Amino acid sequence: MTLNVKGEGLGAQITGVDPKNLDDITTDEIRDIVYANKLVILKDVNPSPEEFLKLGKIVGQIVPYYEPMYHHEDHPEIFVSSTEEGQGVPKTGAFWHIDYMFMPEPFAFSMVLPLAVPGHDRGTYFIDLAKVWQSLPAAQQAPARGTLSTHDPRRHIKIRPSDVYRPIGEVWDEISRATPPIKWPTVIRHPKTGEEILYICATGTTKIEDKDGNLVDPAVLAELLAATGQLDPEYNSPFIHTQHYEVGDIILWDNRVLMHRAKHGTASGTLTTYRLTMLDGLETPGYPA
């Protein structure tokens, strides 16, 4: 099957996908489209949970989220986010992040299906970290090459219902065992495209060290974070891409190169999404650059 792609780059659209006839979509074809464009919108698909799962398995190896409280009641591979009480976990993703950056195997792809969207201006912000890196002068790139960055997700881990009334120290120790700080190369090379990617995150990256474990001047990290646009409170950075979507669309992106955060709109109402996260069998997150 040849998928119909409209546009190119972030937000390119794939049209005409029939959720009841996915057998003709090949893994190589859909992956190549994502690797090339980084963020694609499959328009008006409206799949059932089972069809959404089938498409996810075509894209890659589905990895369920490590915390069961996010799981769909019938399909634990599906991560459910919802502002409707009892339908999922609310207020997810309201900060810049890369999915599973804090785990030993960060995902290759993330795929989201909106089921309810409160208004036309609700969406997601994305930053292409390869484009950011390419924009930096050599003098700013040099201190980051060959270094390792430490990423600590713990202050963004949500308290579970089962944690209520437990001692905070006990909860903190459990979080630290499940998601301890982890180190990745500050600059990675994409295993498929070869692009170099500035692999840092304002809400999780705490320090940069050289190959011998010596702390790099914190100003280097601060300047790199500022260059990405993550610190821009108005979201006016030229590196920030705003993506809107509609119920029934599927948003699929390359999780190695794109970081994202939720864009809250002006309308009240319920937001409910399903998410799948996949590996592609290649080096994750990437090779040291």
UniProtKB/Swiss-Prot annotation:
GO terms for molecular function: dioxygenase activity; metal ion binding. InterPro entries: TauD-like_sf, TauD/TfdA-like, TfdA_dioxygenase. A (3R)-3-[(carboxymethyl)amino]fatty acid binds at residues 65, 70, 93, 100, 158, 275. Its EC number is 1.14.11.78. The keyword Chloroplast does not apply. It comes from the Bacteria. SUPFAM superfamilies: Clavaminate synthase-like. Keywords: Dioxygenase, Iron, Metal-binding, Oxidoreductase. Fe(2+) binds at residues 97, 99, 260. The keyword Metal-binding applies. It holds the Pfam family TauD. Belongs to the TfdA dioxygenase family. Involved in the biosynthesis of a unique class of isonitrile lipopeptides (INLPs) that seem to play a role in metal acquisition in M.marinum. Catalyzes the conversion of (3R)-3-[(carboxymethyl)amino]fatty acids to (3R)-3-isocyanyl-fatty acids through an oxidative decarboxylation mechanism, thereby generating the isonitrile group of INLPs. Isonitrile formation goes through two consecutive, but distinctive, 2-oxoglutarate-dpendent reactions catalyzed by this enzyme. In the first reaction, an Fe(IV)-oxo species is utilized to generate a (3R)-3-{[carboxy(hydroxy)methyl]amino}fatty acid. Then, its conversion into a (3R)-3-isocyanyl-fatty acid likely proceeds by decarboxylation-assisted desaturation. PANTHER family: (3R)-3-[(CARBOXYMETHYL)AMINO]FATTY ACID OXYGENASE_DECARBOXYLASE (PTHR43779:SF3), DIOXYGENASE RV0097-RELATED (PTHR43779). This is (3R)-3-[(carboxymethyl)amino]fatty acid oxygenase/decarboxylase. It comes from Mycobacterium marinum (strain ATCC BAA-535 / M).
